[in-house]
Amino acid sequence: MSGPSMHPVDVANRVIDSGVAEAPHNRVTHQLSVIDDDLAVVESFSHCWIIRTDEGLVCFDAGGVRHGADVVAAVRSWSDQPIHSLVYTHGHLDHVGGSGAFVADAADRGHTAPRFLAHEALPARFERYRTTSDWNVMINRRQFGGVRNRQDLGIAGNGPKFLPDDVAEPDEVFRDKMTLEVGGRTIQLRHARGETDDHAWGWDAENRAAFTGDFTSWVFPNAGNPQKVQRYPIEWAAAMREMLALGVERVYPAHGLPIVGRQRVEAVLGDIAEALEHLAGRTLE
């Protein structure tokens, strides 16, 4: 079994290479693992990836509402540097709900608050969540209620408001691409539609690494259900093809395990693309 003490890369390599689907793949431990020089991940329901630079930390995603403080505590077990920037890969609550804890941590330490970055469609999502708060609470309880009751993951909109008041608004948004340069590191943020219309992913060309958010999640791609807003399986598949064309050799997802090695990346991203293309094609036939 792939228990929390096993390094996530070791678990992923064994699963992909053997074809044996050991569980769990999404380990909600709030523990930090060092993945590479100056790179770590906190495994939560939605992970937080952290890049250490000479100018501070760059994070991808903030974790969920209930566990933002746990995620921050894990980050602080590794580095006391200020958090320079935090990228929202998209606006789902399990990715943005913990952002208030990051802002509070900066205030407690006397640091400048992180700069929050997102795709330009994300603020409209936040506004929609506020306008339709009760409805979002209801549909997420239907989707995740059983999960929440078993594991207390806090992903079902269980507070008085679906989007908490302390969730940080993005300070800067982009449309297609944005270059993030921090402390000698360059990450290109790219937009593609997939599970959401506001999805961003990060491309670290120097290390051939992609921070993929929910484009990869170690489950069948969540291409939609009747109670959710439109999702984009054809564009999602195209994003997988784009990553492969760029030469990605490392995939760092928001759910599940890191995928390291070009052959493994080709297998996983190729399978996701083919599954989505098949799903869309057969549905439209």
Task: Name each region found by the language model.
Residues 1-21, 134-141, 146-154, 159, ...:
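Accessory terminal helices/loops
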Residues 24-25, 55, 66-116:
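Active-site metal-binding motif and surrounding structural segment of the metallo-beta-lactamase
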Residues 25-79, 201-213:
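Conserved beta-strand hairpin/beta-sheet module of binuclear metal-dependent hydrolase folds
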Residues 33-34, 42-44, 172-173, 181-182, ...:
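A short catalytic or substrate-binding loop motif that flags glycine-/basic-rich loops and adjacent residues
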Residues 57, 66, 124-191, 235-240, 244, ...:
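Metallo-beta-lactamase
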Residues 60-62, 82-92, 117-119, 211-213, ...:
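Active-site neighborhood of phospho(di)ester-bond hydrolases with catalytic His/Asp-centered motifs
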Residues 97-101, 126-132, 221-224, 262-266:
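Short acidic, glycine/serine/threonine-rich loops at helix termini
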